[in-house]
A protein has these predicted regions:
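A nucleotide-sugar donor-handling region in carbohydrate enzymes
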Residues: 82-89, 187, 203, 207-289, ...
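Active-site and donor-binding regions of nucleotide-sugar-utilizing enzymes
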Residues: 10-12, 25-27, 31-34, 39-46, ...
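Conserved catalytic-core segment of nucleotide-activated headgroup transferases in glycan assembly
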Residues: 112-127, 245-330, 404-406, 445
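A donor-sugar binding/catalytic signature common to diverse glycosyltransferases
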Residues: 171-194, 343-388
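Donor nucleotide-activated moiety binding/catalytic core segment of transferases
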Residues: 153-168, 317, 322-365, 370
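C-terminal alpha-helical cap of glycosyltransferases
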Residues: 442-462
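Basic, ligand-binding patches in group-transfer machinery
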Residues: 1-102
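Catalytic binding pocket for nucleotide-activated donors in carbohydrate/polymer assembly enzymes
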Residues: 208, 235-236, 329-335, 360-438
Length: 462
């Protein structure tokens, strides 16, 4: 139930996606404001659909809500009633309205520098009338920086944090991990800013979250989530195409004359999960035997990579995924490779790099936003989407990507030299992908996000 828009969500499961619903309030037929059909499949076969209908309950409605499917009245509610009392619905959900209009924003508990930080800064500078706080652990390297800037900081997990999050009207975060979600109750609206562009199918993970609204950056991403017959439960009521808050800063800080390449692969569940519950020595040995470690360690120590970078005067920066940081000492990093400073802004790292080497990570979209080339090193593409924590989505790296896809070191170095010779300028076929991918590149993403958040609590206007 959305008490602000006075809309109620009606859901049911069916094997027939062509059902005709008739929803009646006080014996009058009303029509859904939003509809979504979610498919559930098993072994490549659809076994049922979920229909999700958001229906407006007008202020004049006083009696009962009934639902008919194919002209047959169905039971609704927890106890199998054939109708629900409108007054009771309103009464129950009015109790859940928040106690204040304070907004709590955060990125990770131990790290800022993501969409929530950038949105907070925009609100602080442009809408001081809105009461906001930013949650972070005090030991975070970002705490002092944000404190000096004037952020109203509260320590994540503290008594003050728990007091404020209970009364907050909105919790706004770039992450939706359990350490934060366990604090979310029906009283708050949880706003998901996302950490990166959703390019793969993470519906199983996202569908388990209580998300009132989330923001996306590309049209393909938007369509892959809201369209009927996807695995996502979210539709046009919950998903808004605005661009990411941090992208405004990317545009402002773009550098193009720094000869630096960044190597930034994602992690592998197969290299990490299989070492849980092991002692530290066994854990390290198993990681070092993984294909993931051997391939990336080999590339970092490749003598031809060293020669190319010396010949064309490029520096190399290695930025491991946070899940790989415990194993960083296992990499035999040569003297010419720098480890990215963990205290340095990730946004500035993108801005100060000319080229990225990654595998499947959505960080490639950040470079694409800056119109900088990417090389995808996918030595395990035949098994990655089977053994990792997600399913392949709409994004085709060969067709939709922002640079060449390679499967071995030699091919990677050939593509790298080609880009070095071209002064790291993007080749035309990838340039068109970069130009067509993002819905907005106007520096107004924060403005659109804030306007959407304000609209959330405005009374029904449809």
């Amino acid at each position: 139930y959305d008490p602000y828009k006075e809309q109620i969500l009606i859901t049911y499961y069916t094997r027939d996606d062509k059902n005709i619903e008739s929803i009646r309030i006080d014996n009058e037929v009303i029509y859904a404001d939003y509809e979504k059909i979610v498919k559930y499949d098993f072994l490549d076969r659809v076994f049922c659909y979920q229909k999700r209908l958001w229906v407006h309950v007008s202020k004049d409605a006083k009696d009962k809500l009934e639902v008919f499917i194919n002209n047959k009245q169905i039971m609704i509610g927890k106890y199998g009633e054939y109708f629900l009392d409108i007054k009771n619905i309103r009464k129950e959900f009015q109790k859940r309205l928040p106690k204040s209009n304070i907004w709590l924003l955060m990125d990770r508990d131990y790290e800022a520098d993501d969409n929530a930080e950038h949105l907070y800064r925009y609100i602080m500078q442009n809408h001081p009338e809105q009461e906001i706080v930013f949650a972070l652990r005090k030991e975070s390297s970002d705490w002092e920086r944000l404190e000096k800037e004037g952020f109203n900081l509260i320590e994540f997990g503290s008594f003050e944090f728990e007091r404020i999050i209970k009364k907050a009207s909105k919790v706004i975060s770039s992450h939706s991990d359990e350490y934060l979600m366990r604090y979310i109750t029906p009283r708050q609206q949880f706003i998901f800013l996302q950490h990166g562009v959703t390019q793969n199918d993470v519906s199983k993970w996202l569908n388990s979250k209580k998300i009132n609204l989330f923001f996306v950056a590309t049209q393909m991403e938007f369509d892959s989530i809201i369209k009927n017959y996807t695995r996502y439960k979210f539709g046009q009521k919950e998903v808004i195409l605005t661009g990411f808050a941090r992208h405004d800063a990317l545009l402002r800080n773009k550098q193009s004359d720094i000869k630096q390449i960044i190597i930034m692969p994602t992690w592998r569940a197969s290299a990490i999960n299989n070492v849980f519950n092991s002692n530290e020595r066994n854990m390290k040995e198993k990681f070092k035997r993984s294909e993931y470690f051997q391939k990336w360690n080999s590339l970092l120590n490749n003598n031809n990579l060293k020669k190319l970078c010396e010949q064309y005067s490029y520096t190399v920066v290695f930025k491991p995924h946070p899940n790989i940081m415990p194993y960083l000492k296992d990499f035999n990093l040569p003297f010419y490779t720098k480890i990215a400073n963990q205290d340095e802004s990730l946004q500035m790292l993108f801005c100060n790099s000319s080229l990225m080497i990654t595998d499947y990570s959505s960080v490639a979209f950040e470079m694409a936003y800056l119109k900088k080339p990417v090389i995808y090193y996918q030595f395990d593409k035949d098994v990655f989407f089977i053994s990792h924590t997600l399913q392949k989505g709409y994004f085709d790296y060969q067709k939709d990507g922002f640079g060449p896809v390679v499967q071995d070191e030699d091919s990677l170095l050939i593509k790298l030299e080609s880009l070095f010779r071209n002064n790291c300028k993007v080749f035309n076929n990838y340039k068109s992908n970069m130009e067509s991918t993002f819905a907005f590149k106007d520096g107004k993403c924060c403005q659109r996000i804030y306007a959407t958040l304000i609209q959330l609590n405005i009374k029904y206007l449809m």
